[in-house]
Amino acid sequence: MRNQTKMMLVACLMAVSTPMAALAAAQDYAFEAIKAEVRNGPGGDIAVRLVHKPSGKPVEGAVIFRTRLDMSPENMEGMTTKVEPLTESEPGVYKFRADFTMAGGWALKLQAKVQGEPETVQGAVVFTAKD
């Protein structure tokens, strides 16, 4: 009977500890552009996919709490524009609307919380605004 109790205790400990070991780290996630080119001008829609890199699967339900869109790819980090979040259109795809005021490279910098991940997931995606 004692062996059976010990085995049950070990099984319970394994079941409780396995999810903790399975947690990914913030660097196991990446934001990717759905389409890297966008129309220069007002009301440009952009979309990014949040991916869990080890599995390659999209991550849905992330809470994106900070965004910044600037022209840092063109060495003009001070040139920014407002970013308006839109609704999640498909699992793991996050859409935004912005006014692209100049043709060239724009970096969308994001910070997000992913369920079960204690660290903040951060990333940047480069878009090219074309006339």
Model-identified regions with their sequence ranges:
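Bacterial N-terminal signal peptides that target proteins for export
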Residues: M1-L9
